[in-house]
């Protein structure tokens, strides 16, 4: 590894302004002294996502980096970047919201930013418990990426995935433990149709989020 030691108290969070990455933000603030966020503009369906990410970063007093990754929308048509496509599940079981190589590229650029800011830790909200079958959300991919990033920059990075083995119910429980359940419920954007908070209630992302929240609140005894 190269001579300059990375700051073990500093973390970069891959941040979209959604439930998962915002939960990761508060998890990071609990575990590290210095936290910065990186958001990627890749031609997603709604500019609102970027505005929400900026707003949360501002409210939490966290430095926010916005990187242009619009080239992703040039590579393949999918329902996250093509507004005229309906969200559907393909024959392989993977929804057309899958953006090939998205997390590969996001973690690569988050690693480059970590290198420049001397941050040892990179945090992403990917999960393979309640997920849509995206191959780049799997634990095996993240572990491989951790090795690749470290070798490519001769730095001893650590990629954290606090939500990897949590379903949505458990993710809500974590946000409650962190004292931010209501903040995340009402200020984040998960909805594919761009509705902040509880969302449209119809898209797959909203249904997954709502089912997890309802299950957690029912277990907690809250109406």
UniProtKB/Swiss-Prot annotation:
EC top class named in words: ligase
Binding residues annotated for Zn(2+), in chain numbering: 191, 200, 203, 206
Summary of subunit composition and partner proteins: Homodimer.
UniProt-listed Enzyme Commission number(s): 6.3.4.20
Similarity remark: Belongs to the QueC family.
Binding site for ATP: 15-25
Keyword Transmembrane: no
Highest rank taxon of the organism: Bacteria
GO molecular function per UniProt: ATP binding; ligase activity, forming carbon-nitrogen bonds; zinc ion binding
Catalytic activity: 7-carboxy-7-deazaguanine + NH4(+) + ATP = 7-cyano-7-deazaguanine + ADP + phosphate + H2O + H(+)
BP term (GO), one: queuosine biosynthetic process
Pfam families noted in UniProt: QueC (PF06508)
Pathway(s) the chain acts in: Purine metabolism; 7-cyano-7-deazaguanine biosynthesis
Record NCBIfam families: 7-cyano-7-deazaguanine synthase QueC
PANTHER family, per database record: 7-CYANO-7-DEAZAGUANINE SYNTHASE
Name used for this protein in its record: 7-cyano-7-deazaguanine synthase
Keywords for the protein's UniProt record, in alphabetical order: ATP-binding, Ligase, Metal-binding, Nucleotide-binding, Queuosine biosynthesis, Zinc
Function field: Catalyzes the ATP-dependent conversion of 7-carboxy-7-deazaguanine (CDG) to 7-cyano-7-deazaguanine (preQ(0)).
Cofactor annotation comment: Binds 1 zinc ion per subunit.
Cofactor: Zn(2+)
């Amino acid at each position: 590894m190269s001579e300059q030691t990375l700051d073990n108290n500093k973390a970069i969070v891959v941040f979209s302004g959604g439930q998962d990455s915002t939960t990761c933000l508060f998890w990071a603030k609990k575990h590290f002294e210095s936290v910065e966020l990186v958001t990627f503009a890749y031609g997603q369906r709604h500019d609102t996502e970027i505005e929400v990410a900026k707003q949360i970063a501002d409210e939490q007093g966290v430095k926010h980096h916005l990187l242009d990754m619009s080239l992703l929308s040039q590579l393949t048509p999918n329902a996250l970047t093509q507004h005229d496509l309906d969200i559907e599940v393909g024959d392989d079981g993977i929804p057309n919201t899958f953006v090939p190589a998205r997390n590969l590229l996001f973690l690569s650029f988050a690693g480059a930013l970590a290198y420049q800011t001397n941050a040892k830790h990179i945090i992403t909200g990917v999960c393979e418990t309640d997920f849509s079958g995206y191959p780049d959300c799997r634990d095996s991919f993240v572990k491989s990426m951790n090795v690749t990033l470290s070798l490519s920059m001769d730095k001893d990075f650590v990629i954290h995935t606090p939500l990897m083995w949590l379903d949505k119910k458990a993710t809500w429980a974590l946000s409650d433990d962190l004292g931010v359940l209501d903040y995340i419920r009402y200020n984040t954007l998960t909805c594919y149709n761009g509705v902040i908070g509880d969302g449209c209630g119809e898209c797959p992302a909203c249904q997954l989020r709502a089912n997890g929240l309802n299950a957690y609140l029912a277990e907690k005894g809250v109406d």
